[in-house]
Swiss-Prot record:
InterPro entries assigned: US22-like
A Pfam family: US22
Biased composition (Acidic residues): 566-576
Keywords on record: Virion, Virion tegument
Subcellular location: Virion tegument
UniProt source species: Human cytomegalovirus (strain Merlin) (HHV-5)
Superkingdom of origin: Viruses
Region described as Disordered: spans on this chain: 471-576
Basic residues bias locations: 542-555
Lineage of the organism: Viruses, Duplodnaviria, Heunggongvirae, Peploviricota, Herviviricetes
Name of protein: Tegument protein US22
Family indicated by similarity: Belongs to the herpesviridae US22 family.
Major site of localization recorded for this protein: virion
Length: 576
């Protein structure tokens, strides 16, 4: 029997420790779960009240952090994570840096309040109950009370809560680093045999993960996303052939399907592997996919959304995907420096700054909130009867928001840890925050740069009016001689017309195809490089390609995927 890798062994141990064989009805106990969750919220908010009362007063906040430097505060989600108070001058990774100007989409000011730490798990027999391990994460507050976490290991800034009250309710649920930590429990645990097979696989070996998925072809993985009550099926495929046999890909013309494979290859700048499709099942049987889960050669997990036919990073590896699910596409906001967000293929973060300023301004509270007002609000949020007077009437809405999918959290009260006498071990000081290369440089001074996208017209034979009557001129100028939609690129300035990027790549063999598309120009306008050997090299290639496309005013060529109402029952339309 072959030995498991270190990552697989850690994941397997975490999975086994969180198993709870009790029936779900005994675990949930809806009213008890709601009351317990409210108790945890009030305990967390009471320990963060020093930050809550000073969140709109930066000088008072800095003085408070300096006075309580080294104090640990218990957090939630996960329950064994803590905040170690520390001023910004004592954190070299952020000292004398303007994180708001380098990362955020809008101007703001960020104040550091401390670093995060984690206590060893209860199952660790050698652990010291008086120690906690610091992590490469800094908790920060903005001028408008928004809570951020800066991860200097991956050089990312996460918006984890809109205010401290929401932070006390959800904890670190929206912090990406949580799901990279080996102690974080898995959200996806069923079917048990399927999950066990993946946990025994090296998460950095994309070919092995795809092979495991291929062995389960046609089966479903129950994907759970933390903070959400509904589940989603992941239909296992594991191969290009299996993908081609599923709708809507089986109704795509061969040329369009080949273009889709080449688009993914050129977007990733490396080889890739299919895992499966996420979506939902109709009552009468058919599976309606919303995206394709795939891996690059380094094991990073991406989702190709059918809605806009583009790729988005959803996890660093498949083990992390089993912990976070689709959280990165359900509201997790990550801000990157310079071009790195485009290089990592992160989804464009949603800007909440304008909305929050407008809300404060509408209530006449912009820059006028006093400490006495915050004290009154805190008195209301911490009222003793909140656990009973806020019980919802609809029991179906009582979904858990805790990371632990069972009642195991009740066995480990996160405020019972002796936080007044904790010794913290320093975290690793290195990380991507030290990088200063092409991926960290801005493009024309743009923040949160992403390549603009072109959405192709619908795949229909002829234009119709709103009543369904065919209009004259079916062979319009929007389609070329082959009947396929003509590529239209939005351009900046007066840049001359140039073919889109996927037509200018060097010939590349893609899994499931015999070769790449033919180049339309005698000389490719974008740099063509060798296959990367590290993820950092892939980032550099993606960044150079994005800058070259931006300089020429090109957009991403989206490959049209047929909608359900455009698919007949006789297979793919051969075209006119």
């Amino acid at each position: 029997m072959s030995l498991l890798t270190k990552a697989a062994a850690e994941a397997w141990g975490t999975y086994l420790r969180q198993r709870d064989e009790r029936c779900e009805d005994a675990i949930r106990c809806d009213y008890g779960v709601f009351q317990f969750r409210n108790t945890v919220f009030q305990k967390t908010l009471s320990m963060l009240q020093g930050l809550y009362l000073r969140q709109y007063d930066p000088p008072a906040l800095r003085t408070y952090v300096q006075r309580h430097q080294g104090t640990t505060v218990a957090l939630r989600n996960p329950a064994n994570w803590f905040l170690v108070m520390r001023e910004q001058a004592a954190i070299p990774q952020i000292y004398a840096r303007s994180l708001a100007a380098d990362y955020l989409c809008c101007d703001d000011t960020l104040e550091a309040v401390g670093v995060l730490a984690v206590r060893p798990p209860d199952s660790d027999l050698t652990r010291n109950t008086k120690q906690a391990q610091e992590l490469p994460c800094v908790l920060m507050l903005s001028h408008y009370g928004t809570v951020y976490v800066y991860d200097w290991e991956t050089d990312g800034l996460y918006e984890v809560a809109s205010d401290i009250k929401a932070f006390s309710k959800n904890g670190l649920l929206w912090c990406e680093y949580v799901y990279r930590h080996p102690q974080t429990p898995f959200a996806t645990t069923e079917p048990r045999y399927h999950v066990q097979k993946f946990l025994c696989t090296d998460p950095t070996d994309a070919a092995a993960v795809a092979k495991t998925a291929r062995e389960m072809n046609g089966l479903n993985l129950v994907i759970r996303t933390p903070g959400r009550t509904e589940v989603e099926p992941l239909l296992m495929l594991g191969s290009i052939e299996g993908l081609r046999a599923c709708r809507p890909f089986d109704h795509m013309p061969a040329a369009d399907f080949r273009d889709l494979l080449n688009f993914i290859r050129q977007r990733l700048c490396c080889e890739w592997y299919v895992v499966g499709l996420v979506g939902y099942y109709l009552a009468y049987g058919p599976f309606v996919p919303s995206g394709m889960v795939l891996l690059d050669k380094f094991g990073v997990v991406y989702l190709h959304k059918i809605e806009d036919s583009d790729l988005y990073r959803i996890a660093d590896n498949f083990h992390m995907f089993l912990k976070c699910g689709l959280l990165k596409l359900r509201g997790l906001c990550r801000f990157d420096r310079g071009l790195r967000g485009e290089c990592r293929l992160e989804e464009l973060p949603v800007c909440h700054h304008t909305l929050k300023r407008d809300v404060l301004r509408w209530h006449g509270a912009l820059g006028t909130i006093t400490r006495s007002q915050l004290e009154s609000a805190l008195d209301w949020f911490l009222r003793p009867t909140r656990g009973t007077d806020k019980v919802p009437n609809n029991s179906s809405a009582w979904g858990r928001t805790d990371l632990l999918p069972t009642g195991a959290l009740q066995d480990n009260q996160n405020w019972a840890f002796p936080s007044h006498s904790v010794e913290t071990l320093p975290a690793l000081q290195g990380g991507l925050w030290e990088d200063n290369d092409e991926t960290t440089q801005t493009v024309d001074g743009q923040r949160c740069f992403r390549m603009p996208k072109f959405f192709p017209p619908p795949m229909c034979r002829a234009p119709y009016n709103e009543c369904g009557v065919e209009l004259p001129g079916g062979d319009s100028s929007d389609e070329d001689e082959s009947g396929r939609p003509r590529r239209i690129a939005n351009r900046i300035g007066d840049t001359p017309e140039t073919p889109c990027n996927s037509e200018n790549e060097d010939d590349t063999t893609v899994e499931g195809t015999s070769g790449g598309p033919e180049a339309m120009d005698s000389q490719a306008p974008y740099p063509s490089e060798d296959s990367p050997t590290t993820e950092k090299e892939a980032w550099l290639q993606r960044g150079r390609r994005a800058k070259a496309m931006h300089a020429r005013g090109h957009t991403l060529k989206q490959v049209p995927i047929p909608e359900p109402d455009q698919m007949g029952d006789d297979g793919p339309d051969p075209g006119p």
